[in-house]
Structure formats: structure tokens, C-alpha cells
């Protein structure tokens, strides 16, 4: 697909791959922290906490059983693609635990399974992606510390990058979420897309101060006097996103706007898959949402490498010395767990035995 930025026409990745990139970004703590900044300047807030999305996999199973079977087959072939809670062991160390999290405020997600809650309660140390989320001020400071990474500093505005139709669609989408268009006019497309991708009900809960899962885990632990450690900084997440081409993020934003209310269905389906532990089905499911196509310029491959795989390595490397103390409860985004390059396999390569807790 070709889009125009300024006077340049550029070829960008196909719809399916771009949506995968957007949803992967949705799983970054950075996107969750961003909302605190946006909502702080919002003059209006969405009032309804009720999410109205439907499960796309249920619909697919009914309408296209063959395609559904393909999705299940691909998910089953994903290493460590089943389960969100894992036990980490090593001779001479107390058992530690790994939870795949989802950075949302959905009460179904916040309600940890009893065995996971018991492990969290009994742990000496809590590890999350970034401990900066314990303070909204620190999170906001991290986001604003490098304005060139989050904002256009050369006079560019989002209005100049979008068609009149897409710009109007963006304004309407933000208004439904209680975010004024003026608040994001100079923000980079990926910053805006992170907010637009979330259902209005999620925005509403965040506006009311309801924490997302990782934030709640960390806050509860800090209140109990437990040590809370982070594996990366929000600035590092910021840098990773900013290193990808603006055209990539602009296309993600446009596609999010085009999906409209269907994004509610996508997020609801992701949530259902998370709650059932079918993490390996997330990416195959997303491929059914957008049209098929080839990624001629390998944009998604670059995204996956920089945002998922590279960060997996950082998380596993930095977690190892903390896990060496034993009795650790670690929570990172669930999409970081599965696959040959996932956190689970990387921890195994460091000598840990990691097994699923049923």
C-alpha cells in the first residue's frame, strides 16, 4: 500500500502485518503510561465502563470452520503458546514464578487466578517490565524527557500527515475517548495510535484511576513493603518505538481508524484468549482481522525484532540475576512469553527450568 507523507509517496507494509505491529505495541507499558498523560489534559472523559466487543474467534469458528482450524493449528505449533503462569526453578534456589500479563484495567484480568495470587503474596521480590509505573509523575516524566521521540519538533502536525477524511475520523475517535484533538496535534502517530486502539471503556476506567494489571501488582507489592524491580525503563521502550519509520506508525494509525468499532472486537478477543491461556493464538487470530498480503519491505519483521525479540533478550538477561535470589514473582506482557525467542525459552537457555502451572 502507498501513502503520502509531505511530498513523498512511500510503500509500506500490508494491512495484516501493520495491525500485528499495532497490537504488539498495545502490550507495551509505554502505551498504558501514555494514557495518563493524555487524560491529564483531557477536558472530557468517556463515561461508560461497559465494553461491547465480541469474540471474533467464536464468530470465525461458526462462519469459517476451515479457517478457524488453521488458526488453531498455527497456535498449537507455537512453542510455549499455552498458559500465562509458569514456575521457574534452579537447583539451590527457592521457586520463582512468571506471569504473562495484559496491560489493561479489565476486572476479569485484574482478578488473578488463586494460585497466581498466592505466589505473588508469598514472593519476596516483585519484578515487572518497568518500576516507573509505580508513579504516574515518573511515568509522565519518562515520556516527556525526550520530546523529540514523542513529539514532532520541526513544525509537523498530524493534520499535515493525514488526509482530510482521516483527520476528521481521528478527531471523532479521540472525542469518543474524551481526548481533545488539540492535545495530540504534534504527537507522533504511534503515540496517538496507542490511545485510539483502546476501547472507550478502557479509557474510562483509566480516567477513573483504575490501575492496569502490572500497575496493580506493583502497587500492592510496594504497599506491603516488598521490593519491586523493573527490567527496563519507559525511556527504553520509547526509544525502541521511535526508531521505527514514521511511515510505519502512520499506517498503523490509519488502519486503526479504518477498523473503527471493530477494534473493540479485537481487544475483546485478545482478552478472552488471555483469560483462557491461549497466548499462542493471538497472532494467528490477528491475521484473520485484516486482508492477507505480503510484507515486501519486511517492515513487520523489523518491528518484531526491535519491539518484541530484542526486548525479550533484555528482559531475560536482566531478570537472571534477580531470579538468582529466588522467590521472585515476575510479570511481563504475555506476548513476550511464547516462541523460540520468547522469555521462557531464553530463561531455559540460562539454566532455569520453566514449566507451565495448570
For the regions a language model picked out, list residue spans one by one:
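Bacterial N-terminal signal peptides
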Residues: 16-17, 21-40
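Sec/Tat signal peptide C-region and signal peptidase I cleavage site
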Residues: 42-46
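Structured, acidic catalytic/metal-binding patches in enzyme active sites
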Residues: 47-303
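N-terminal secretory signal peptides that target proteins for export/translocation
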Residues: 1-24
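Intrinsically disordered, low-complexity segments
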Residues: 7, 40-41
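C-terminal soluble interaction/assembly domains
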Residues: 301, 305-358
